[in-house]
Amino acid sequence: MENNRNFPARQFHSLTFFAGLCIGITPVAQALAAEGQANADDTLVVEASTPSLYAPQQSADPKFSRPVADTTRTMTVISEQVIKDQGATNLTDALKNVPGVGAFFAGENGNSTTGDAIYMRGADTSNSIYIDGIRDIGSVSRDTFNTEQVEVIKGPSGTDYGRSAPTGSINMISKQPRNDSGIDASASIGSAWFRRGTLDVNQVIGDTTAVRLNVMGEKTHDAGRDKVKNERYGVAPSVVFGLGTANRLYLNYLHVTQHNTPDGGIPTIGLPGYSAPSAGTAALNHSGKVDTHNFYGTDSDYDDSTTDTATMRFEHDINDNTTIRNTTRWSRVKQDYLMTAIMGGASNITQPTSDVNSWTWSRTANTKDVSNKILTNQTNLTSTFYTGAIGHDLSTGVEFTRETQTNYGVNPVTLPAVNIYHPDSSIHPGGLTRNGANANGQTDTFAIYAFDTLQITRDFELNGGIRLDNYHTEYDSATACGGSGRGAITCPAGVAKGSPVTTVDTAKSGNLVNWKAGALYHLTENGNVYINYAVSQQPPGGNNFALAQSGSGNSANRTDFKPQKANTSEIGTKWQVLDKRLLLTAALFRTDIENEVEQNDDGTYSQYGKKRVEGYEISVAGNITPAWQMIGGYTQQKATIKNGKDVAQDGSSSLPYTPEHAFTLWSQYQATDDISVGAGARYIGSMHKGSDGAVGTPAFTEGYWVADAKLGYRVNRNLDFQLNVYNLFDTDYVASINKSGYRYHPGEPRTFLLTANMHF
């Protein structure tokens, strides 16, 4: 469709600030755009600018049909080039390019998080991770060896993907075969005997067929932690038939195996804000921090996982303006782990003498044996057309999805206490066997959606979307009877101790209507202002498939609870400057989350909570000059409880694991044809942690700065080297902390990574 432009109530209390921000950024952006135009006018031949490898111009998800610069949402796209330059080998590392997003939460007091435990704008986003627009379930670490780009969308994503976190989603785009042949390989070695190799082979066969193979292997020790090791292997073959024609068939497979040592963290003794949990343990107030290398697990701890994903996608171009796609995917993620962690509190400390070096702390064994499966078929149609003088950019579709999860019950493991300052990991508990007390969850979803962008005039656009999800969740769980402790049940007459007894068998069905609407006005050819409003819902058990009977007061997943609802307002501006090589954005946002489930003082749950996250965010991505690239951003966010029980340790209304200030910037410069230099810095402000009645633990973590650097050298067209240095100034900081505050994960110390990249 041809056009002069590339068309394929309550006010915020900080609106005055944002207006000033927009006024400030507008003349700067206009001046930069004018400078680029002036430079073009001074030449006799005007060449089209080369798109920046640091700022992909388009989302790979067909639901987002407009360019990133014209999308009325806060969206960060982390390109493959950024991932390579930074040596980011997993999703959590790649997300360091997005301000305020990270793995800040280390789990509850009795268990720990694993994998990509991401928080974004005050909410757990670990269950809103997608691969090619399809939900990827499982608490595992996701490698980037088969990733083309990572798309981070802030604000409710229910209209885009169905039930999801109220504050954002993450979409990893897989590599696909392309219309050129070549081989890229890398070999890396680094601190703590880090070893990694990757292979990316693309081969064209005939005129319309191409195959691609990505392979990865990695073994490493954690540079800052004793005993913690990680090992993973992956293979991802793919083939496309009909490349360059109107009919294309893509076949993809992904297999990843991981053998890791889980890390339960170390005691927070000695951190700012720590105090002994009782008068009898007051010596801990002066005994100093534990060695951050200490490992409080056992030599038997393990975290094994296997991911298998098979995808078939067929695309047909009905005409030049209309394409229909059908995607079928089957995926299974199996995870089995034993993770040992300390148990906080004065009652768990044993004091054989007055010397704190002899004191011990109780340990708990966290176990998981789970299998997640998803089977989905999705059909999408995109089309650009006119109705009269109004242009349309339409994306519509239907989705059928079945997600299942089985948590296998295992027998409990008893562990001896561990010395607080001199832990001994040479323990082999054994006895980790299944007991038949399983939990099974299944959710079937049918969804239909439609999005449209209307070009009203040359400069003015309206957009909107609606999605209807019809879902049905079934859940049953059993408990081994005759046990002790929380959740224990007595054995019915005639049932042997340890036998599985069904305790929950229930179901929940319903409809979710999510929608969004926005407007965009182009102030110039390269700059716009926009507004957007979105509504997103998530039903009870929407994250973990777990349900409880209606009226059962001791569960947050009761079937009589209403869906959680998030309403987000956003106003922003986006500018493409320097001949459209650099994208500048600024946005003011507010998200109100309703129907939050709160735990009462007696341990029961009620649904009366309300949260609010509001603030602003600015970002930059692209090229300042052909040789100078950067990506970064800053956010200021205030996350509070508007109604409900305060969840912060200090009794404030602040939401935990949400830094009020966060900054990130990475910049790379091509100094000569053969030498490149890069540097980056990120800041995570102080964060409140959760509260569960723990005594003496830190109420918040302190803010910190971390700097990274890179040096690249090209030997010839077939070989180049890069040296990455992480945490350049060896900053000591708290990377994550658990809810009670008894345990934390220290940030990784200064490390080095040397990589040889080969191209053929």
UniProtKB/Swiss-Prot annotation:
Q: Specify the superkingdom.
A: Bacteria
Q: Using the record's annotation, list all stretches that form the TBDR beta-barrel domain.
A: 180-760
This protein's record includes keyword Transcription: no
Q: Where in the cell is it found?
A: Cell outer membrane
Q: Where is the TBDR plug domain?
A: 67-175
Q: What is this protein's name?
A: Catecholate siderophore receptor Fiu
Q: Which UniProt keywords apply?
A: Cell outer membrane, Ion transport, Iron, Iron transport, Membrane, Receptor, Signal, TonB box, Transmembrane, Transmembrane beta strand, Transport
Q: What does this protein do?
A: Involved in the active transport across the outer membrane of iron complexed with catecholate siderophores such as dihydroxybenzoylserine and dihydroxybenzoate. It derives its energy for transport by interacting with the trans-periplasmic membrane protein TonB. Can also transport catechol-substituted cephalosporins. Receptor for microcins M, H47 and E492.
UniProt similarity note:
Belongs to the TonB-dependent receptor family.
Q: Which Gene3D superfamilies does the record match to this protein? A: TonB-dependent receptor, beta-barrel domain, TonB-dependent receptor, plug domain
Lipid bilayer topology: Multi-pass membrane protein
Any one GO MF annotation of this record: signaling receptor activity
Cited Pfam families? Plug, TonB_dep_Rec_b-barrel
Give the record's GO CC terms.
cell outer membrane
The record's listing under InterPro entries reads: Plug_dom (IPR012910), Plug_dom_sf (IPR037066), TonB-dep_rcpt-like (IPR039426), TonB-dep_rcpt_b-brl (IPR000531), TonB_box_CS (IPR010916), TonB_rcpt_b-brl_sf (IPR036942), TonB_sidphr_rcpt (IPR010105)
Placement of sequence motif TonB C-terminal box = 743-760
Give the signal sequence positions: 1-31
Tagged with keyword Transport: yes
